[in-house]
Amino acid sequence: MSIQNLNTRDPFADAIKGNDDDIQDGLVHIRIQQRNGRKTLTTVQGLSAEYDLKKIVRSCKKEFACNGTVIEHPEYGEVLQLQGDQRENICQWLTKVGLAKPDQLKVHGF
């Protein structure tokens, strides 16, 4: 089974429509939240609406061996939520797949 919707953008469209229009404020925010004890949640906010976030979560779950979901946050909109501290993994994966450039990633947390 292949992921079909991760690379839906045209590589030549940047010259036509401007740079980085697929990311809302130009940044992808990666946050970590403490749950109970040693358990944490990693949230990813700021990815373009043109990507299917459920397919991205499905791919991340397989890649990182963790559970995840897409939640509707009242302030941030649709947010990816992954179990565990996946900040470094998600940064490397987003740049490897081409969904974000390294200078667009903003990591928050401890």
UniProtKB/Swiss-Prot annotation:
Gene Ontology molecular function terms on file? ribosomal small subunit binding; RNA binding; translation initiation factor activity
Q: Which PROSITE patterns match?
A: SUI1 (PS50296)
Output the InterPro entries linked to this UniProt entry: SUI1 (IPR001950), SUI1_dom_sf (IPR036877), SUI1_euk (IPR005874)
Protein family:
Belongs to the SUI1 family.
Q: What are the BP-aspect GO terms?
A: cellular response to hypoxia; formation of translation preinitiation complex; regulation of translation
* CDD domains to which the protein is assigned, alphabetical: eIF1_SUI1 (cd11566)
Looking up Pfam families in the UniProt record yields: SUI1
| The protein's name in its UniProt record | Eukaryotic translation initiation factor eIF1
Q: Which UniProt keywords apply?
A: Phosphoprotein, Protein biosynthesis, Translation regulation
> Which residues does the record list as Phosphothreonine (modified residue)?
40
Q: Quote the cellular component terms of the Gene Ontology held in the record.
A: eukaryotic 43S preinitiation complex; multi-eIF complex
Going by the entry's taxonomy, the superkingdom of the source organism is recorded as Eukaryota
Q: Write the signal peptide boundaries.
A: none
Q: What does this protein do?
A: Probably involved in translation.
